[in-house]
Amino acid sequence: MPKTNNQKKVNTFKNILKKQMKKTLTLLASLVLFFVASAQSNQSTNSAVNPAKDWKFGIALWTFHTFSFAESLDKVDSAGLKYIEPNNFTKTLPELNDSSLMQLSPSGIQKLKSLIEQRGLKCESVYLAGGKDIDAWKKQFEAAKQLGVQFVTTEPPLDMWDSIDSLAGIYGIKVAIHEHWKGMSHYWNPDTTLLAIKGHPNFGVCADLGHWPKSGIKPLDAIKKLSGHIIAIHLKDIAAYNNPKLVDVPVGTGVIDFPAIFRELKKQGFKGPIYIERDATDQPSNLPSVIQEVKYYNEQVSKL
């Protein structure tokens, strides 16, 4: 019996439906494979990072800037920390005429380096205040090279990105762009930092967690935006958002969600220094709060 027009329409519809089903199943299978691969990739990244081992926990010596260099090292030792980040403007040692790092001769820098090594400490970075011309920057990079650091933490002028990136390449030292708050730093907004990094292979980020809230920026959001570029962390807390006049509070007592930040850093595969840094000057010293922060950090990292 010949097929009626209705039967032909039904068969045509069935064929179309089968084709659509095949396409849908193929698409679903592809999506499943994609999500499985993504999950495996994330798991691989996470498992590849051991925070207790791969995060170099230490302190920025600015924390003890009211003390001599030797006294600062004593306090670092008392806190049980290993990695330090000095800066180029704090007085060094009486036997070096209390000169700043940038004023020292090569032999003076070697003496400072030997003192650090004798204490069993490691110095992989230094904070540079920078300068107005390339000669000033070159002098500071030269001192950083003699000190044996891997990167410098600094805030390069907007019109010197190219020249400072070139200097970094010449000296084999990375530049970790640091930020202060709005009105004090060009880099208060992570978008500016990303602009600086673009086209400058020697640039990365030193994320100061306690400064972003002063500009109304959530540190976790900034960390996510800067993923893949973070060289180091300045560990710092603050009591409230949108108040640039506030000084920091001990880590874990303010508004910053550190557990979420630590999870995000692990997810990103971050491996590098995490430096405690206090701007506040507790009396008689910041050492008690630093010890408190060390305990808090170790507790949080043990949960990752």
Protein language model features and the residues they cover:
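Active-site-proximal loop/turn and secondary-structure-junction residues that shape catalytic pockets
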Residues: 63-65, 88-90, 129-132, 157-160, ...
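Histidine-acidic metal/acid-base catalytic patches
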Residues: 39-61, 65-83, 145-148, 166, ...
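Bacterial Sec-dependent N-terminal signal peptides
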Residues: 1-45
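Metal-dependent catalytic neighborhoods of phosphoester/phosphodiester hydrolases
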Residues: 95-99, 103, 134-138, 286
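Catalytic-core regions built around general acid/base machinery
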Residues: 101-118, 163-170, 261-264
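Glycine-rich, proline-tolerant flexible connector loops at the mouths of alpha/beta enzymes
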Residues: 85-111
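Active-site acidic/histidine proton-transfer and metal-coordination neighborhood
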Residues: 115-204, 213-216, 287-288
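Short beta-strands and strand-loop turn motifs
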Residues: 86-88, 123-126, 174-179, 206-207, ...
